[in-house]
């Protein structure tokens, strides 16, 4: 997939959640979220928004090894291009924090209203049926 990417984020192993939380922090701070979708379809948004405070760009850069400006660029690209989809492979889930990775990806999709619409959502890519 890398040859087709406009931006390739080379993060440290195990830093997926921090990267996604940092992207969501940017989206909230810059008002790129889908407020109507959140109001109609999401619960506990205020608590979620509060949890993002721990993921400022400097902290995310330190945790992930990804330059802050790349995190911001990824967040803006994802939020500004509708519909957006998240595709992931088995490596995303095959770790002690795999469930947290999927939850964070789903939260990113919901934050931007990129779920339940054609060409959107959170989509695992597997080599066999029902692998996920």
Language-model features: locations:
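Cofactor-pocket helix-loop regions in the catalytic cores of large enzyme subunits
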Residues: 1-130
């Amino acid at each position: 997939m890398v040859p087709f990417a406009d931006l390739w984020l080379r993060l440290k192993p195990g830093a997926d959640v921090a990267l996604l939380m940092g992207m969501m922090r940017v989206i909230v701070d810059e008002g790129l979220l889908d407020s109507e979708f959140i109001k109609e379809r999401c619960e506990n948004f205020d608590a979620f928004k509060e949890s993002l405070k721990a993921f400022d760009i400097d902290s995310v850069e330190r945790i992930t090894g990804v330059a802050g400006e790349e995190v911001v660029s990824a967040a803006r690209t994802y939020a500004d291009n509708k519909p957006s989809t998240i595709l992931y492979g088995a490596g995303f889930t095959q770790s002690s924090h795999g469930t947290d990775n999927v939850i964070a990806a789903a939260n990113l999709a919901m934050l931007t209203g990129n779920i339940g619409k054609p060409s959107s959502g959170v989509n695992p890519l597997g080599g066999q049926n029902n692998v996920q």
